[in-house]
Amino acid sequence: MNKLRQSFRRKKDVYVPEASRPHQWQTDEEGVRTGKCSFPVKYLGHVEVDESRGMHICEDAVKRLKAERKFFKGFFGKTGKKAVKAVLWVSADGLRVVDEKTKDLIVDQTIEKVSFCAPDRNFDRAFSYICRDGTTRRWICHCFMAVKDTGERLSHAVGCAFAACLERKQKREKECGVTATFDASRTTFTREGSFRVTTATEQAEREEIMKQMQDAKKAETDKIVVGSSVAPGNTAPSPSSPTSPTSDATTSLEMNNPHAIPRRHAPIEQLARQGSFRGFPALSQKMSPFKRQLSLRINELPSTMQRKTDFPIKNAVPEVEGEAESISSLCSQITNAFSTPEDPFSSAPMTKPVTVVAPQSPTFQANGTDSAFHVLAKPAHTALAPVAMPVRETNPWAHAPDAANKEIAATCSGTEWGQSSGAASPGLFQAGHRRTPSEADRWLEEVSKSVRAQQPQASAAPLQPVLQPPPPTAISQPASPFQGNAFLTSQPVPVGVVPALQPAFVPAQSYPVANGMPYPAPNVPVVGITPSQMVANVFGTAGHPQAAHPHQSPSLVRQQTFPHYEASSATTSPFFKPPAQHLNGSAAFNGVDDGRLASADRHTEVPTGTCPVDPFEAQWAALENKSKQRTNPSPTNPFSSDLQKTFEIEL
């Protein structure tokens, strides 16, 4: 009975170890190289692992997957998770797992990404491999159970795929001919060849090109031999012939590097320029970036060159060379260089500096008579002045006069420059400009000549007597019209204006200021003055068009004193105080309020018989008073005080 029962049972195959079946392994190696090696398997699944290699890592993954199958099978019964029956295809390109029923591609793994494969020591039919996931960049272990074969045979087949892939890669590297050589003298690496992988189609095209190049080279050699025997001058290849310059270049390239792939070039006929072609003549100029058939140089772009050259000059005041520039233009340049339109120091308060005392000057006499400088009230004969525009903090010397008004600008710019450039010292001007006395003498002579040349024209002007003091009602009128040559302020306050005394003087044209108000030129008297008087006249009256005639002829000078009314104080000063016209928006000088520089008896008028005041000192006081009203330093800017004695020439 027992034998009968055994006869009906399925007989098991005799177990033959894998080591005793080398003939099957050899067929697996051939199948892997041809891409026909496949094994029926059950795909257990994949899990993430911590390491990229190790048999214990693969065994742990198999245990985890089999445990999950048992849990689902026990919990859901027969509807649990089952292993998928599939076919494992092993080739030199990669591993592919295809569903046996649906023929769906479950796994497609390139062989280069597989880091480790091994059979399982606990399960004879188990096999697993570890790979790098391309998306998550994690190590994934895929596990299989062989149906007919052992896991050792599957692992051997994957090993054969590794070897085939390595051989193919070495063959590609040998074909591309990439070699790296090190030059000790230049300490550089030189790479020859290309790492680009050629496909089968490219390889066929390359072989065809190589064959054509060899044929062209052979034809060229034959033609050269024939041409040299017939006519030595007819050896130049025609454009349509296969021996074109492109062919020559590829031939020489092939001789130097046989593995190089020649570039594709257009035929010469297509590259020939047509007769109707018109170039771009504007692009062939000197500054054009397309003047060469080379790469564009960034440093030679017009915008780059302009950006490199358009930087501010460090020394804004150029050196004087000869007599090309006048003192007026130099004054204008220095004023432009050192006067800023706005105050950069406006954040924190600062203590006020001390008062600057006006320097002393020698006694000045006009025609041998002491010329008293007195404060005169507003004249009765007034002329309508232009509408006063709001005073902007701008530089009145921003627009220098032209060459035709050099003499006028020379007389106008002396005092204004001395007041507006407080940050500069006289030594700086003398150090930056190598001044010589002879040039100053020549300048004085030019001014004297121009003044004397215009004297006959000015002598016809009628002389007007000293104007009478105005009635008291004229003082209390803030909106009354001012004198025509007065430099008006933007504040409607009564200010003292010098009477329009008109001796023989040079009528100079007025020029506009940056804020839109006409700035009249000073009036220079010409009654037999000396060069020193001319200097005093220029630098004493250039900045004050209101003080029309500080140095007048003796017949016109009256020892009179009129009260002076200001908007800030009700006191009178024996010195002339011009209107509160200032450039920097300040109305006090170095923090001292108005009237502090006046004499002790400031609340009393100076009697008519007092001693005559030194005119030059009075002018300096007037300068100081004007700077007091227009150059008060900002509480945060120590450089805003721009009163400065320019220079003094004694002859």
From Swiss-Prot:
Family matches, as InterPro entries: Numb/numb-like, Numb_domain, PH-like_dom_sf, PTB/PI_dom
GO molecular function, one term: beta-catenin binding
GO biological process: adherens junction organization; axonogenesis; lateral ventricle development; negative regulation of protein localization to plasma membrane; neuroblast division in subventricular zone; positive regulation of cell migration; positive regulation of neurogenesis; regulation of postsynaptic neurotransmitter receptor internalization
Key words of the record: Cell membrane, Developmental protein, Endosome, Membrane, Neurogenesis, Phosphoprotein, Ubl conjugation
Domain PID: 33-193
PROSITE patterns in the cross-refs: PID (PS01179)
Main location: membrane
GO cellular component entries: apical part of cell; basolateral plasma membrane; clathrin-coated pit; clathrin-coated vesicle; cytoplasm; cytoplasmic vesicle; early endosome; endosome membrane
Membrane topology label: Peripheral membrane protein
Post-translational events: Phosphorylated on Ser-276 and Ser-295 by CaMK1. Isoform 1 and isoform 2 are ubiquitinated by LNX leading to their subsequent proteasomal degradation. Ubiquitinated; mediated by SIAH1 and leading to its subsequent proteasomal degradation.
Annotated region (Disordered), positions in chain: 228-255, 419-483, 623-651
Modified residues (Phosphothreonine): 102, 243, 436
PANTHER family hit by this protein: NUMB, PROTEIN NUMB HOMOLOG
Job description of the protein: Regulates clathrin-mediated receptor endocytosis. Plays a role in the process of neurogenesis. Required throughout embryonic neurogenesis to maintain neural progenitor cells, also called radial glial cells (RGCs), by allowing their daughter cells to choose progenitor over neuronal cell fate. Not required for the proliferation of neural progenitor cells before the onset of neurogenesis. Also involved postnatally in the subventricular zone (SVZ) neurogenesis by regulating SVZ neuroblasts survival and ependymal wall integrity. May also mediate local repair of brain ventricular wall damage.
Subunit structure, as described in the record: Interacts with SIAH1. Interacts with LNX. Interacts with CDH1. Interacts with TFAP2A and TFAP2B. Interacts with RALBP1 in a complex also containing EPN1 and TFAP2A during interphase and mitosis. Interacts with AAK1. May interact with DUOXA1.
Name recorded for this polypeptide: Protein numb homolog
Gene name of this polypeptide: NUMB
